[in-house]
Amino acid sequence: MEAEGLGWLLVPLHQLVSWGAAGAMVFGGVVPYIPQYRDIRRTQNAEGFSTYVCLVLLVANILRILFWFGRHFESPLLWQSVVMILTMLLMLKLCTEVRVANELNLKRRVFSDFDPHHFWHWSSFADYVQCVLAFTGVAGYITYLSIDSALFVETLGFLAVLTEAMLGVPQLYRNHRHQSTEGMSIKMVLMWTSGDTFKTAYFLLNGAPLQFSVCGLLQVLVDLAILGQAYVFTRYPLKPAPHAAHPASAKAL
């Protein structure tokens, strides 16, 4: 009787844990960008945040959604991509408005010019939306034509998670080039590391496609490498640290 009562209690507890993990998976990825968004709004200065972070995450999550049509995976991972896309669009909108307001003599640059020198440096948020829609349309059409190819679908999934996994590499390279982590927020990197570790464990425990687990592990390794740089360059400085960058740019460049 006691065992039955305990079992009755454990079933809803297991469901609550599952729902909590799914919720953390869906919304956890955007948490680091909330203080960054608030900081940009408060200071009206977006120089410390690279909009290329938005580009990488938009491409990665659009490809992940397209991958879902070829091979269904956990619903929380699909909703995570939707939430991240909306978050990055909000970040782009704010950054564009702030930059245009601060640059009085800004020459208007539009997506329809197709000028590679000004790519992702346009004057209006609408141009970024046009670019995202164009990429989604082209990638979606190619996926529609190739959806029956298992090789294409698996490659699409790999490209999606590999793109996201490479997000920390520019920071890793910047630290190595300057032989310093001055201006980089250690708290942010720790947050990325814990988030990527949780995400990878979620992939492994829920039987997500292999690409997700492999690239999740790669993300964790990149995060740990950045933390290793912070330890080495702080403990054994090789040269005077360069001018401090804005903490919000930690994973941007």
Swiss-Prot record:
Keywords: Membrane, Repeat, Transmembrane, Transmembrane helix. This is Solute carrier family 66 member 2. The keyword Nucleotidyltransferase does not apply. It is a multi-pass membrane protein. GO terms for cellular component: cytosol; endosome; membrane; trans-Golgi network. GO terms for biological process: phospholipid translocation; retrograde transport, endosome to Golgi. The chain crosses the membrane at residues 7-27, 49-69, 72-92, 125-145, 150-170, 214-234. Residues 14-80, 160-215 form the PQ-loop domain. Coiled coil: none annotated. It is found in: Membrane. It comes from Bos taurus. Its main location: membrane.
